[in-house]
């Protein structure tokens, strides 16, 4: 006997969470629960506005269609909508007990704001000091100066930077100009500095600052391959698709000598704990990019270890579909 339930959640965000062009006031998504006999499995379907190709309503329609087949005993292919494919594949993997339970709860802290505050946070980091800094929101020169100050002040710090394709080549060069060449090797990578891949490649080769592909990974013509100046690919499962697609990308990256980083798309605590399990399984040597829970005002169904945020339980969620 198979049953399935689809829940909808809405979690208020902290003030000041801005995506590309809009403030994100709440994080809205779906949780799916599959039940077969004594076994159950959960997954999260949460398209990210401005980044996902599908809306939440479109994802819900696709999920309901897939679930209708599943409860009838008909096995369907992965959804073509990445967030749906990811959430349903997680639920199936939990149900089939193929998603390992061990998790990598390390997270590269996401740093925004005042450099003095960042310094205190980063100095207190235990173990390997890896942090992520969003760049491209302010002047490129300011970003360069902040990165330089942090690397200079903390000799054991490695930074991951993310520009979200926001710079022209000239602005990217303006950023690099303010980062001491002797410190640039401690930038693990800068995600997609320029508006085009060609400009980003040239930037990496001209400055010695390694880059990573992020948005590119989700484009139809993208190939995972070794290239001069390219250090990593960033895999955001909600935007990429099923667990098997994520696994394929990780394997291709490792074969090409690239680092693969499992990264969040601002999922709820349930989705984040699954990403931590995915990271421990597929990329155990790499700190995942999962420091987004504190952008929210609550957790959902499954808590992140040691988080003080209140937990929204299953009983508090709205059921949108059940069979």
Curated annotation (Swiss-Prot):
Name its co-factor(s). Answer: a divalent metal cation
Entry annotated with the keyword Nucleotidyltransferase? no
Query: Known Gene3D superfamilies for this protein?
Result: Enolase-like C-terminal domain, Enolase-like, N-terminal domain
Tell me the route in metabolism or biology where this protein functions: Quinol/quinone metabolism; 1,4-dihydroxy-2-naphthoate biosynthesis; 1,4-dihydroxy-2-naphthoate from chorismate: step 4/7; Quinol/quinone metabolism; menaquinone biosynthesis
Q: Is Metal-binding one of the keywords?
A: yes
Name the Enzyme Commission number(s) assigned to this protein: 4.2.1.113
Task: Indicate the residues that form the catalytic site.
Answer: 134, 236
Record keywords:
Lyase, Magnesium, Menaquinone biosynthesis, Metal-binding
Cite a single GO MF annotation.
Answer: magnesium ion binding
Annotated transmembrane regions: none
Any one Gene Ontology BP term: menaquinone biosynthetic process
Q: What is this protein called?
A: o-succinylbenzoate synthase
Q: Which organism is it from?
A: Yersinia pseudotuberculosis serotype O:1b (strain IP 31758)
Q: Which gene encodes it?
A: menC
